Swiss-Prot record:
Subcellular location, record wording: Cell membrane
Gene3D superfamilies per the UniProt record, alphabetical: 3.40.50.12240
Family annotation (InterPro entries): ATP-synt_VA_C, ATPase_a/bsu_AS, ATPase_F1/V1/A1_a/bsu_N, ATPase_F1/V1/A1_a/bsu_nucl-bd, P-loop_NTPase, V-ATPase_su_B/beta
Gene symbol of the encoding locus: atpB
Entry function: Component of the A-type ATP synthase that produces ATP from ADP in the presence of a proton gradient across the membrane. The B chain is a regulatory subunit.
GO cellular component terms given for this protein: plasma membrane
Disulfide partners: none
Protein name: A-type ATP synthase subunit B
Length: 462
């Protein structure tokens, strides 16, 4: 679009439906372009082009289409895509889903204005995810180790404490090493006012806000803003990582609300629906978010992602968790059964997996015994869980002494490793020491996954 076209105001709005309006007789308009809208009473609004074909453009209005009409509404196409002004001063601030200050502070003086869609990374320019990120949560650090540049989702369900877990991770997460700079970018999408107050209060009262940038999109905010929020958050994270050399952890919650907004917009555009009514391009759209995690050659900083999503009806085969699993590098699954037992955080380590855990474990990263002792504990816990089903049928009296030790181990594992306080920040050394303590429950001859050298070095003497 040339400079002359940017000054043209169109009054050829032919149709308004829900949050969308259709403008006829336009030319040179591109998909994703930002639109300035003037209402009949002179109020200014903003929109974005969702579809451009021939001489027609379909525009989603961020603030909604109330008070707009087809005869007096004026539209100007800016020729620019959605951008956000970024600055190091964003740390310690809270913004709405569109990047406007929500904490009563001043507007940010931008050091740069960046396209919120990011820029495609050549796969050759990527470094593999590496180095340990400590969350202070034993079931993540120990069994599902998070590494810099990784993307690993948390699969939760309605009513499970994923919000509490998200704020605990944001508060406790850190990278180990002298002089390493670390920050958290937290983006909440489609949340209630109560949840918003909870997040803001937690960040403020715990001091976590000092090293964080927070974006809040409420359930009654426009659906198109919900689409922008994670992109704005990731653009901020990329700036802090690749321009300021920081290691950035991005926590996105709730991706289910994001996908519902995608479905809402697709329905308003009368698109042909895919699985369960979601648009056919949802996989591509999610990939555009998740693939912005990583490490770039020649850049000091990294972007690590923990997207959180609630599985409708606890169905892990639902399109949202299903497609997410194809793109990301594992998953952390919250269990309703563990939650009913009063266990927090209710992380079920058996279906959980970090495909890149090995990149962050071992001497110089965590500890030399990490992978072996966790493998031993995982196998013992899995056997103990299986024995619970057997006990339900034949009773505990029918078990051998060996079986009873594994059953006891499974209970102790849940009560001392999985369970931890909401304010309990465990180092990886503490987690591994707790695991070794539990292994004393098992007969020595059952410790087949750890070497004699490691047993001599770490196993407490009875």
């Amino acid at each position: 679009m040339d400079a002359m076209q940017k000054t043209i105001e169109y009054t050829s709005v032919s149709r308004i439906a829900g949050p969308l309006m259709v403008i006829d007789g336009i030319e040179g308009v591109a998909y994703g372009e930002i639109v300035d809208i003037t209402t009949p009473n002179g109020e200014k609004r903003t929109g974005q082009v969702l579809e451009a074909r021939e001489e027609i453009a379909v525009v989603q209005v961020f603030e909604g289409t109330s008070e707009l009409n087809t005869s007096e509404t004026k539209v100007r196409f800016t020729g620019d895509t959605a951008k956000i002004g970024v600055s190091y001063d964003m740390l310690g601030r809270i913004f709405n889903g569109a990047g406007k200050p929500l904490d009563g502070g001043p507007e940010i003086i931008a050091e740069k204005k960046l396209d919120i869609n990011g820029y495609p990374l050549n796969p050759v320019s990527r470094n593999p995810p590496n180095a340990f990120v400590q969350t202070g949560i034993s079931t993540i650090d120990g069994t599902n180790t998070l590494v810099r540049g990784q993307k690993i989702p948390i699969f939760s369900g309605s009513g499970l404490p994923h919000n509490k877990l998200a704020t605990q991770i944001a508060r406790q997460a850190k990278v180990r090493g002298e002089g390493e700079q670390f920050a958290v970018v937290f983006a909440a999408m489609g949340i209630t006012g109560e949840e918003s107050n909870y997040f803001m209060d937690e960040f403020k009262k715990t001091g976590a806000l000092e090293k964080a940038v927070v974006f809040i999109n409420l359930a009654d905010d426009p659906a198109i803003e919900r689409i922008l929020t994670p992109r704005i958050a990731l653009t901020t994270a990329e700036y802090l990582a690749y321009e300021k050399g920081m290691h950035v952890l991005v926590i996105l919650t709730d991706l289910t609300n994001y996908c519902e907004a995608l479905r809402e917009i697709a329905a308003a555009r009368n698109e042909v629906p895919g699985r369960r009514g979601y648009p056919g391009y949802m996989y591509t759209d999610l990939a555009c978010l998740y693939e912005r995690a990583g490490r770039v050659k020649g850049r000091e900083g990294t972007v690590t992602q923990i997207p959180i999503l609630t599985m409708p009806d606890d169905d892990i085969t639902h399109p949202i968790p299903d497609l997410t699993g194809y793109i990301t590098e594992g998953q952390i699954v919250l269990s309703r059964e563990l939650n009913r037992k009063g266990i927090y955080p209710p992380v079920d380590i058996l279906p959980s997996l970090s495909r890149l855990a090995g990149n962050g474990q071992g001497e110089g990263k965590t500890r030399d015994d990490h992978s072996k002792v966790i493998s031993q504990a995982y196998a013992a816990y899995a056997e103990g869980r299986g024995l619970r089903d057997l006990v339900a049928v034949v009773g505990e009296e029918a078990l051998t002494e060996r079986d009873r030790s594994f059953l006891k181990f499974a209970d102790a594992f849940e009560n001392s490793i999985v369970t931890q306080g909401v304010d309990e920040d465990r180092s990886i050394e503490e987690t591994l020491d707790y695991v070794w303590d539990l292994l004393t429950i098992l007969p020595r001859e059952e410790l087949k996954r750890v070497s004699d050298e490691l047993i001599e070095k770490y196993l407490p003497k009875k």
